[in-house]
């Protein structure tokens, strides 16, 4: 076992050095802000006991996510990464936050719960699919140990058709690119070879649309992402069901993607994971999976008192006087249900909690609908609109003094 761990450390060191040698400044994804991640968890009945959350970024890179999250919680923030230069940058950008931020340059294999403590929210983004399988298993076990009950983790991964399309090209590139050359030179050589391949495909005249789209996507990636997705021999597409199976033994279960998939109302985590994989193999994609440490994730419900509902839709009545709600794109939602119309009219003006919406809508339909019917219709509509990305649920706990005003 000692020999195996030594070998894994050598691979990890090589991965870290590649980040040190190729400049990398990742984009921050706004959907990963705690209010949206914890809002998704609340939809499945996962509740936080406190507004103050402690956050761990396992693979923090240059600290962009830590810096962003710092303004959203007064809790403890810990970031770990293999890359020394990335950790130095992360420490620089968070130095004004004082001792509540702790950035560590350390191997996953050297971390444990006693060292780190426990957290309410863990990010494991851009990491799980570029490390050896044994290290990934160790990282997932560490995540499960470090999550508090009710804690949530975001894990990003590639799944579906695009990684499969590129598998042959990835193998060919690794075979023809000299791995002893500096990482930057390897990337340049590989990009040139891919450009040649794309040119050949365009001249061939066959139906190569999916492959050409995948190659164009690669051309837009920064050098570090390109290196690890094409030349790193540890790169592995992952399945949602595989992650669920590995984490579920520790009581951590798949909820949904941060951009919800069409499986949100399934009650069992493994059922959601299996459908997620089926969807991925139909269209492929880079996923942000949200998992929570809970006994069992409940069926999705909009009724949590900790959720503030909002929408970007605005009302535009069409030529026939019918209510149409648009978000600025060409796609608009035509509404025929008067309760749904009232719901969207309210949300398009300002955010509401479920109990407030229920009271307002019930008042509009007094004498025509029972409050229990309004409750059922609102819950169904909000969940349906959320699953289509037309409304959003922001985690914003009710202040303790008024927490008893939530719905039954």
What are these regions (language model features)?
Residues 84, 265-291, 332-408:
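Long, charge-rich, low-complexity alpha-helical segments
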Residues 113-122:
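A short acidic, Gly/Pro-enriched loop at the edge of an enzyme's catalytic core
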Residues 137-149:
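A short glycine-rich, Lys/Arg-flanked "PGG" loop and its adjoining helix->strand segment in the class I
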Residues 76-81:
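Conserved SAM-binding motif I beta-strand of class I
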Residues 62-73:
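Conserved SAM-binding loop of SAM-dependent methyltransferases across substrates and taxa
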Residues 30-53:
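Conserved alpha-helix/loop element of class I SAM-dependent methyltransferases that forms part
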Residues 154-181, 189, 193, 197-203:
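Conserved class I S-adenosyl-L-methionine
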Residues 98-110:
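Conserved SAM-binding strand-loop segment of SAM-dependent methyltransferases
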């Amino acid at each position: 076992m000692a020999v195996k761990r030594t070998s894994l450390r050598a691979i990890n060191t090589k991965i870290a050095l590649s980040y040190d040698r190729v400049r990398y400044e990742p984009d921050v994804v706004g959907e990963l802000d705690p209010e949206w991640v914890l809002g998704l968890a609340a939809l499945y009945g996962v509740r936080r006991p406190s507004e103050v959350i402690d956050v761990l970024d396992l693979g923090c890179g240059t600290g962009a996510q830590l810096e962003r999250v710092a303004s959203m919680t007064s809790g403890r923030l810990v970031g770990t990464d293999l890359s020394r230069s990335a950790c130095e940058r992360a420490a620089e950008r968070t130095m004004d936050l004082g001792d509540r931020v702790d950035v560590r340059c350390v191997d996953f294999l050297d971390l444990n719960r006693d060292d780190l403590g426990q957290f309410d929210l863990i990010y494991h983004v851009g990491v799980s699919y570029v490390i050896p399988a044994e290290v990934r298993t160790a990282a997932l076990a560490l995540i499960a140990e470090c999550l508090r009950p009710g804690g949530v983790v975001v894990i990003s991964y590639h799944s579906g058709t695009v990684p499969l399309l590129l598998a042959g090209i990835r193998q060919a590139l690794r075979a023809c690119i000299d791995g002893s050359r500096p990482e930057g030179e390897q990337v340049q050589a590989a990009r040139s070879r891919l450009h040649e391949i794309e040119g050949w495909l365009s001249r061939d005249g066959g139906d190569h649309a999916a492959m050409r789209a995948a190659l164009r996507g690669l051309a837009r990636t920064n050098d570090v992402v390109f290196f690890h997705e094409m030349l790193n021999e540890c790169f592995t597409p992952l399945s949602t069901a595989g992650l669920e199976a590995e984490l579920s033994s520790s009581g951590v279960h798949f909820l949904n993607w941060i951009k919800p998939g069409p499986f949100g109302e399934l009650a069992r985590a493994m059922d959601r994971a299996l459908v997620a994989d089926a969807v991925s193999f139909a269209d492929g994609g880079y996923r942000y999976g949200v998992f929570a440490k809970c006994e069992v994730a409940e069926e999705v419900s909009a009724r949590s008192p900790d959720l503030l509902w909002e929408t970007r839709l605005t009302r535009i009545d069409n030529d026939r006087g019918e209510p149409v709600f648009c978000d600025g794109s060409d796609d608009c939602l035509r509404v025929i249900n008067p309760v749904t119309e009232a719901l969207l009219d309210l949300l398009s003006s300002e955010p509401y909690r479920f109990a407030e919406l229920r009271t307002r809508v019930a008042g509009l339909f007094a004498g025509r609908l029972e409050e229990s019917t309004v409750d059922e219709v609102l819950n169904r509509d909000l969940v349906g609109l959320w699953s289509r990305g037309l409304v959003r649920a922001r985690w914003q706990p009710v202040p303790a003094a008024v927490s008893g005003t939530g719905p039954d």
